[in-house]
């Protein structure tokens, strides 16, 4: 599995060219993309500037000597490469297994070309088997948990050891065990309108390409060619 993830990440790095501002994703597959960018900077003299999606990726990028800038200092990003936990046939996805969904979506929004790198196990017919992360403010989180519980969403707080995980933005994450999300757009809008929800892990209609690594090699799926 690690070999497939590395293959997807290295393939995505081929889309990066000199002068780009690039979004550096978070997670086990995006990790290899960031590593390959670091290698190309060192060995090929690649000239890029990165914008990171988590403190973990920031630390990785700094260790590799990748020049970084703040999302607040730029208007657009040429290319962002990130992982995904599930991708359906309509190119909607669930992200946030690494608890970085808020920063990931902030970086994805001003991106000209948004690429996901996944192994073939992440391709699904319907989203929802992977628990949907919902980032919530700490104030009122238990009340919101009960709201989700009454709605039948089977919520659970994301934990780190015996304490609730706190995200880079100092929020909690409530994971929803939905089983199947029939309409990701409708459910995303419902969460967007829920007071106390900062962001959710539904990335609907955002991705341009999905690079899939499987036993037979790498496949590049183009979202605009989907039916």
Curated annotation (Swiss-Prot):
It catalyses: aldehydo-D-ribose 5-phosphate = D-ribulose 5-phosphate. Homodimer. This is Ribose-5-phosphate isomerase A. Keywords: Isomerase. The keyword Iron does not apply. Pfam families: Rib_5-P_isom_A. Belongs to the ribose 5-phosphate isomerase family. Pathway: Carbohydrate degradation; pentose phosphate pathway; D-ribose 5-phosphate from D-ribulose 5-phosphate (non-oxidative stage): step 1/1. InterPro entries: NagB/RpiA_transferase-like, Ribose-5P_isomerase, Ribose5P_isomerase_typA_subgr, Ribose5P_isomerase_type_A.
